[in-house]
């Protein structure tokens, strides 16, 4: 079944099925202390994560927008800007969605055999799932690497504390709430876009790189 209406209906069922009772703290932290970007420990860490070209991350993601609200387990596999996969799977059922980026564009498929492809990844993501999240930037945001032209802050833990970044005319902010103690990789991240009223809360349980 590759009928678009059927696929969107099944996708809606998937999104509904992964709604959870857990609450999402969507407010940015306040009164946070930061240190200078020239901090030597931060600069060493930045060089380390810049060398991580391909990686995997597993955890849980929560998303809120004016039209969608869901929580899901996720698996993220990133090779390069033209090759990455985001797998979303339900917390309470067998429903699964695959979002795959490839040379010719993006393909979104589910465990029922439905799929849809398009050259414009942004529009496909909006049409099928209702998300307007720049996945091409998420690859760097997830591992705590600020963009070259981003306005960012370094926390007292000598790791990325927060950043502000403009994408397609709107502003995204990120707050890195906690890090894993064993590898200094992000654990809890809060992403917000006030102009589009989107909130993305990510908890990374496992890093592979």
Residue ranges and their predicted role:
Residues 2-11:
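Bacterial N-terminal signal peptides that target proteins for export
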Residues 111-166, 170:
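Flexible, processing/modification-adjacent segments and terminal tails
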Residues 58, 69-71, 77, 82, ...:
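Beta-strand-dominated lipid-handling architectures at cellular/organellar boundaries
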Residues 83-131:
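An acidic-aromatic
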Residues 45-67:
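A short, Trp-centered hydrophobic/proline-enriched beta-strand micro-motif
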Residues 144-209:
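Gly/Pro-enriched, hydrophobic low-complexity segments
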Residues 23-26:
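Bacterial signal peptide processing site
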Residues 18-21:
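C-terminal motif of bacterial Sec signal peptides marking the signal peptidase cleavage site
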């Amino acid at each position: 079944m590759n009928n678009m209406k059927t696929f969107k209906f099944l996708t809606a069922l998937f999104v509904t099925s992964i709604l959870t009772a857990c609450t999402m703290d969507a407010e940015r932290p306040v009164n946070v202390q930061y240190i200078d970007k020239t901090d030597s420990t931060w600069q060493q860490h930045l060089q380390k994560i810049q060398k991580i070209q391909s990686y995997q991350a597993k955890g849980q993601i929560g998303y809120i927008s004016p039209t969608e609200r869901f929580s899901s387990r996720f698996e993220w596999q990133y090779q390069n800007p033209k090759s990455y996969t985001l797998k979303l799977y339900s917390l309470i059922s067998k429903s699964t969605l695959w979002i795959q980026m490839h040379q010719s564009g993006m393909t979104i498929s589910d465990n029922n055999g439905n799929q849809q492809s398009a050259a414009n990844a942004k529009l496909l993501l909006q049409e099928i799932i209702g998300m307007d999240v720049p996945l091409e930037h998420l690859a760097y945001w997830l591992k705590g690497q600020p963009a070259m032209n981003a306005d960012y802050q370094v926390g007292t833990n000598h790791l990325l504390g927060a950043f502000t970044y403009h994408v397609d005319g709107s502003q995204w902010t990120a707050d890195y709430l906690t890090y894993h103690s064993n590898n200094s990789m992000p654990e809890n991240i809060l992403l917000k876009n006030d102009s589009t009223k989107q909130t993305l809360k990510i908890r990374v349980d496992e890093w592979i790189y």
